[in-house]
Amino acid sequence: MKIGILGGAGYTAGELIRILLNHPEAEITFINSESNAGNFITDVHEGLYGETDLRFTSDMPFDDVDVVFFCFGHGKSEAFLKEHKIPDNVKIIDLAQDFRLKREGNDYVYGLPEINRADIAKAQHVANPGCFATCIQLGLLPAAKLGIIDDDVSVNAITGSTGAGQKPGATTHFSWRNNNMSIYKPFQHQHVPEICQSLNQVQQLAGNGDFSASIDFIPYRGDFARGIFATEVVKTELPIDDIVAAYKDFYHDAPFTHYVDKPIDLKQVVNTNKCLIHCEKYGNKLLITSCIDNLLKGAVGQAVQNMNVMFGIEEDMGLRLKPSAF
């Protein structure tokens, strides 16, 4: 597969390049960055020293590639496509939020393989899910299939600083972020609609009607670089053994999403494309914990997973990664 990358200078693009350089079926044809054209990739992504001598380019030779990854900031992908024509035979995987929500004229398939694998396999265009959205909905989807989410869901999730992107800002500065934490966008985070969209899809397919509960989501900024750890609380009288069995069955064929019987932590998933999930019951309250690496399963790892599915190769190819901590 010949690959083009647009918006090649950010954190997500750097991770994408790292994954693709080690992917046995991938060949990077071009990495576009207007601001870095002519510079070596390693001038920006210094962790790739010794792995590539590619340079950034201002060119976009779409006729020479099979698939293009959009690593733009949110809102820029749709604007780009209005000004540039990409050949119909070239597949697109967009990592921004522009096409995640279904609407008239949007042919992008929502790129969560755990529920949309068959559609992704036939898709020409895929909208890669958001990082918080991935972690939270993977924690809740089996509960939606069970039909037990009939009350508001309390969600808390903390993310690493790379989730804010490469551009420096007041809340990403080391002196502020280190030994600190804070909330942002409480009850109004942009990922909530896509979470509800997927929960509605699964709940309807299971014959449990429309999803109408509120996702009361409080996002937190953490003082670490990578990872998302989320808790989701659902009220239900269903016994824990039945819930665990349903979770294991839901993800039985998912190569990266796993229900585990012990409590989970971030170090088990950082630098991998995995999502780990654990459930506990306290009275009528079901506590679900889920965690991912925000740059991998929450971004480019899932994007490459989608690419693999789109081209009919092994879903985990190039993504058999070891956690960085142990």
Predicted regions and their residues:
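Predominant activation on well-ordered alpha-helical scaffold segments within soluble catalytic domains
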Residues: I17, Q137-A144, V192-C196, V244, ...
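Short, solvent-exposed beta-strand edge segments and adjacent coil->beta transition regions
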Residues: A123, M181, G227-T231, L287
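N-terminal Rossmann-like NAD(P) cofactor-binding subdomain of oxidoreductases
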Residues: M1-P186, Q204-D210, H278-Y282, A325
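C-terminal active-site/capping subdomain that shapes the small-molecule cofactor and substrate pocket
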Residues: A230-F326
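A short coil-to-beta-strand element that immediately follows conserved catalytic motifs
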Residues: I28, D151-V155, D210-D216, F256-V260, ...
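C-terminal substrate-binding/catalytic lobe of Rossmann-fold NAD(P)-dependent dehydrogenases
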Residues: H189-Y259
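Short Gly/Pro-enriched turn/cap motifs at secondary-structure boundaries
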Residues: I183-F187, Y220-G222, D265-V269
